From Swiss-Prot:
The lineage of its organism: Bacteria, Pseudomonadati, Pseudomonadota, Betaproteobacteria, Burkholderiales. Its EC number is 2.7.1.33. The gene is coaX. It is found in: Cytoplasm. It comes from the Bacteria. The active site is at 128 (proton acceptor). This is Type III pantothenate kinase. GO terms for biological process: coenzyme A biosynthetic process. It is an enzyme of class 2 (transferase). Pathway: Cofactor biosynthesis; coenzyme A biosynthesis; CoA from (R)-pantothenate: step 1/5. Belongs to the type III pantothenate kinase family. PANTHER family: TYPE III PANTOTHENATE KINASE (PTHR34265:SF1).
Length: 295
């Protein structure tokens, strides 16, 4: 069991997950330990998400949190997979808004917070996958975990019961998969997750058919079945490889569209990456100083 300790108590924590499409964030007091995870998500004090082109609005969200808190500038923990340009823009804006903020850029490494990295080259593992696994390992220790993150890409990651990130799979996300069909064929229409969600809302999960009688439904059902099939096969492999207990955790922006099509028990989580960042902050992890700290 990893012993948690509070960061600098007078400084709140700003946790940032900068993904390929959106920037997710959470704000919490430093003396609040990473919570036990319950169905439905993690109870942050404040949280939100915005697309990359709303950085100005994002900063205002954070400014409002800080004004309400009435305390010192935050300790900021950032996971970025969207590239150095967005990372630098985030750091610059945070430095302008919060004088004295301490920034930490997290990267994948050989081990952290009780989790060992089983990648051949630990640095190659996506930061979001690594930090999300840190969060999941904290929430469900001594458990064989299948972590499904349904975002721009869909990732299936395995955490062994002994605390080793064993590896995983990367698939095109639901939206990317559906768009690829329309953009690389002459006659197939483009549909999105909204169409899939509306289709599923119109029928009970037990009534979802195995095939479709029109092109739009054939695309939607084909793509989501491909994703669900990969998850089911990986779930079976997890059970064959490791002793229990077992848990499948579903997160990411497309999780609600994928959930009705899964046939194994699973638990939803709003953001394992943010939970992992909070765990790292509470285990004394150093991270890499961001631009604001180096200046």
């Amino acid at each position: 069991m990893i012993r948690l300790k509070a960061p600098t108590p007078e400084r709140p924590l700003l946790l940032i997950d900068a993904g390929n499409t959106r920037i997710k964030w959470a704000w919490t007091a430093a003396d609040v330990a990473p919570p036990a995870v319950a169905p439905g998500g993690t109870p942050w004090q404040h949280a939100g998400a915005r697309p990359h082109d709303q950085l100005a609005e994002l900063v205002e969200d954070w400014r409002d949190c800080h004004a309400g808190a009435g305390m010192a500038p935050p300790d900021v923990w950032i996971s970025v997979v969207a590239g150095p340009a967005l990372r630098d823009a985030l750091c610059a804006r945070i430095a302008r808004v919060f004088d004295g903020a301490r920034l930490r850029i997290v990267a994948s490494e050989a081990a952290a917070a009780g989790l060992r990295n089983g990648y051949r080259d630990p640095a190659q593992l996506g930061t979001d996958r690594w930090v999300g696994a840190v969060g999941a390992r904290h929430a469900w220790p001594d458990t064989a975990l299948l972590l499904v993150t349904a975002g721009t890409a869909t990732t299936l990651d395995i955490v062994a019961p002994d605390g080793r990130f064993a590896g995983g799979l990367i698939l095109p996300g639901l939206t990317l998969m559906m768009r690829a069909l329309s953009r690389n064929t002459a006659q197939l229409p483009e549909i999105d997750i909204g169409y899939l969600a509306a289709r599923d809302d119109a029928q009970a999960p037990a009534d979802v058919p195995s095939w479709a009688d029109n092109t739009q439904d054939a695309i939607a059902l084909g793509c989501v079945t491909a994703q669900a099939g990969a998850i089911a096969q990986t779930w079976q492999a997890l059970q064959a490889q490791y002793p229990g207990p077992y848990r499948c955790v579903l997160s990411g922006g497309a999780r609600a569209a994928l959930a009705p099509h899964l046939r194994m028990p699973f638990q939803m989580h709003d953001n394992l990456v943010l939970l992992g960042l909070q765990v790292l902050a509470h285990t004394g992890h150093e991270g890499r100083p961001g631009a604001a700290t180096q200046a």
